[in-house]
Amino acid sequence: MTDVDIKIENIVASASIGKDIVLTEVSEALEGVNFNREQFPGLVFKLKDPKTAALIFSSGKLVCTGAKSIDDSKLAIKKTVDLMRTIDTEIPHEFEIKIQNIVASANLESTLNLEAVALELEDTEYEPEQFPGLVYRLSDPKVVLLLFGSGKVVCTGAKTRSDAKLGVERAYDRLSELDLI
């Protein structure tokens, strides 16, 4: 199998603290919070380190986006919950953090004829009038790759870094087998 370098661009993680949150209290107590109930049902809290944004909902669910590593994603959620705990001391200390999506990019170091790829490769969608990339859906690992004529690839839907890397490498190998790269 070919070794392709991937770069994590974004990680989306979520957690549920198992307790309802009074959003107005949080928005008044924390700096860096945007809250407009008419526009969006949750708070948007921007953290500087790690540079992320957390969406906080009244149900106690949090969604963190913008992290470039799984560790930073988890750290951002923990920091956000710790800050919320200064407002509401009954927020539990134990909660599960789940990685929902990893977006990664890679460069196949070769241009691609996307029309030929669409004809030869199964599980693809290519409508250049709608979107310049070819959508390639893999089942193992369960990821979606966006392939561009430049040879750039975006992988989405991965739950682990290794799944993102494996998805890109399997696509590279399949393209090589078909003499498309």
From Swiss-Prot:
Extent of the Sequence repeats: 8-84, 99-175
Family listed: Belongs to the TBP family.
Function, as annotated: General factor that plays a role in the activation of archaeal genes transcribed by RNA polymerase. Binds specifically to the TATA box promoter element which lies close to the position of transcription initiation.
Superkingdom field: Archaea
A GO MF label: DNA-binding transcription factor activity
Matching HAMAP family: TATA_bind_prot_arch
Keyword Transcription regulation: yes
Listed GO biological process terms: DNA-templated transcription initiation
Name of the featured protein: TATA-box-binding protein
NCBIfam families: PRK00394.1-2 (NF001593), PRK00394.2-6 (NF001601)
Sorted UniProt keywords: DNA-binding, Repeat, Transcription, Transcription regulation
